[in-house]
């Protein structure tokens, strides 16, 4: 059966998309809007190879594989053993089992040993500074930068990104300024920015960024509302995610 013909069965133990299923009961971070936003938005050009840093359940990896119609190899790197096993199972059950490869590895070590270079790197990274521990060490690792600092992440991506490649991330709005200041100090350049709000009455809470190692002029900025005044999905959000959500 081809990828285009594949229709996943509805199941209660994860999240069913139009063309694949994500089980996430062994992953610290469940399927959520952040990952869906990044997987649907990350700009695709003429990609040769894609890297997903901290892939979790492999959600973003499989979204990108779908968008590329399985023509572009995707390496999905995940430090947590349980999450990496589940990610590999999700990939194996998808139409892109021959396209996406899950690596149980630390991205710092992976970036030093992989022979590949990437035209696109994506990450939904840890974003909180060390604080009150979460209920499980697995969730603490996924949420706090003590497991992967933003500086280490930027250095690791720099080591494997092609000269004209792009690094795309999704971050909480309150830390974007510090992240961009750090990135610029490490010779990264902002290419694209999207400020995301839940609805017109709510402030921006997430930001999508595309960074390059070559200066880009001009920098493109835009805004995205997830829901409208009536709390229905906005036309822009529907257009962005309609290839994935069953309800769209």
Curated annotation (Swiss-Prot):
Gene Ontology CC entries for this record: cytoplasm
Cited SUPFAM superfamilies: S-adenosyl-L-methionine-dependent methyltransferases
Keyword set includes Lyase: no
Subcellular location: Cytoplasm
GO biological process: methylation; tRNA processing
Reactions that this protein is recorded to catalyse: adenosine(37) in tRNA1(Val) + S-adenosyl-L-methionine = N(6)-methyladenosine(37) in tRNA1(Val) + S-adenosyl-L-homocysteine + H(+)
E.C. no: 2.1.1.223
GO molecular function, one term: tRNA (adenine-N6)-methyltransferase activity
CDD domains: AdoMet_MTases (cd02440)
Alphabetically ordered keywords of this record: Cytoplasm, Methyltransferase, S-adenosyl-L-methionine, Transferase, tRNA processing
Record carries keyword Chloroplast: no
Entry similarity comment: Belongs to the methyltransferase superfamily. tRNA (adenine-N(6)-)-methyltransferase family.
Function: Specifically methylates the adenine in position 37 of tRNA(1)(Val) (anticodon cmo5UAC).
Official protein name in the record: tRNA1(Val) (adenine(37)-N6)-methyltransferase
Origin organism lineage: Bacteria, Pseudomonadati, Pseudomonadota, Gammaproteobacteria, Enterobacterales
């Amino acid at each position: 059966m081809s990828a285009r013909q594949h229709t996943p069965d509805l199941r209660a133990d994860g999240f069913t998309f139009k063309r694949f299923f994500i089980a996430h009961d062994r992953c610290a971070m469940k399927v959520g809007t952040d990952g869906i936003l990044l997987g649907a938005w990350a700009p695709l050009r003429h990609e040769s190879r894609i890297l997903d840093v901290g892939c979790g359940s492999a959600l973003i990896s499989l979204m990108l594989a779908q968008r590329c119609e399985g023509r572009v190899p995707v390496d999905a790197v995940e430090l947590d053993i349980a999450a990496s096993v589940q990610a590999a199972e999700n990939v194996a059950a998808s139409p892109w089992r021959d396209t996406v490869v899950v690596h149980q590895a630390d991205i710092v070590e992976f970036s030093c040993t992989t022979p590949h270079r990437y035209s696109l790197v994506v990450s939904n990274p840890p974003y909180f500074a060390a604080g009150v521990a979460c209920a499980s060490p697995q969730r603490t690792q996924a949420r706090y930068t003590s497991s992967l600092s933003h500086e280490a992440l930027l250095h690791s991506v720099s080591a494997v990104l092609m000269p004209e490649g792009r690094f795309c991330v999704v971050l909480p709005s309150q830390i974007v300024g510090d992240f961009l200041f750090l990135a610029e100090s490490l010779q990264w350049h902002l290419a694209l920015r999207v400020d995301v709000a839940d609805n017109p009455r709510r402030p921006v809470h997430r930001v999508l960024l595309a960074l390059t190692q070559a200066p880009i002029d001009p920098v493109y900025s835009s805004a995205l509302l997830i829901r409208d005044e009536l709390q229905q999905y906005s036309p822009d959000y529907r257009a962005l995610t309609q290839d994935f959500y069953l309800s769209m």
